[in-house]
Design a protein with these regions (language model features):
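S-adenosylmethionine/decaboxylated-SAM
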Residues: 2-199, 203, 207, 211-217
């Protein structure tokens, strides 16, 4: 489910700029098409990277993924910016470390791949490392509950990311999708310092002789 209204609101500042966009989970290519039209077609130096295996997942067992992949590839072929649409037909566990090792950074990242919490968390941590300052990270399906228990949904992972990265993110929107902006890190909290108290020496209750004996080697 793609929230075009929120995208238009929070991504408009990137239009016409040489942005780098990453999508984890391309599926039919609907978001890829939107990214191409709104960003790549407006700047010859803008690039899109899409990661997907088109092999399916536990929540999608009755879908023809060959047809889904073909739909995405058809969108790429028809795009005026097709030479700057880079498809990585790999799992995110393989593709994201590859991108990270190349030092590629992104202005916009959209995560909509595996819905399993541990997978979403893995993708998000790597993506945060590739997201530029003032870049935007979008999570899809925050409120998705098709599978039980909750560890098979994105929400626990997204909640964890918002908590862990709280000092360096701004929550732009939270609904079925969550949109975060990476900002300069805020001051990290420090341990509260107690007021200095006067130290008072108290006489030991151990007899002097015993103290002396206990220290004899």
């Amino acid at each position: 489910m793609i929230g075009w209204t929120q995208w238009d609101k929070h991504l408009s500042e990137f239009k016409g700029k040489p942005v780098h966009i990453l999508e984890v989970g391309v599926y039919t290519g609907a978001a890829m098409e939107k990214f191409a039209e709104c960003f790549l077609d407006l700047n010859p130096n803008a690039h899109y990277y899409g990661v997907d295996t088109w092999e399916g997942s536990p929540e999608y067992t009755d879908i023809d993924f060959k047809a889904i992949e073909k739909a995405a590839m058809d969108i790429k072929k028809k795009s005026p910016s097709k030479s700057r649409i880079h498809i990585m037909k790999k799992s995110s566990a393989v593709a994201l470390p590859m991108l990270l090792s190349k030092g590629i950074t992104f202005d916009i990242i959209f995560i909509d791949a595996s819905h399993v919490a541990k997978d979403v968390l893995f993708d998000a941590v790597l993506c945060m490392n590739m997201l530029k300052e003032n870049g935007v990270l979008i999570f899809d399906d925050y409120l998705w509950t098709k599978l039980k228990p909750a560890i098979f949904t994105p929400k626990p992972a997204i909640d964890s990311i918002m908590k862990i990265y709280e000092p360096e993110i701004e929550v732009l929107y939270s609904g079925y999708q969550v949109i975060l902006k990476k900002v300069p890190p805020k001051s990290f909290p420090t341990k509260s310092v107690e007021k200095t108290r006067k130290k008072t020496r108290t006489k030991s209750t151990v007899p002097d002789k015993m103290q002396s004996d206990s220290m004899t080697i």
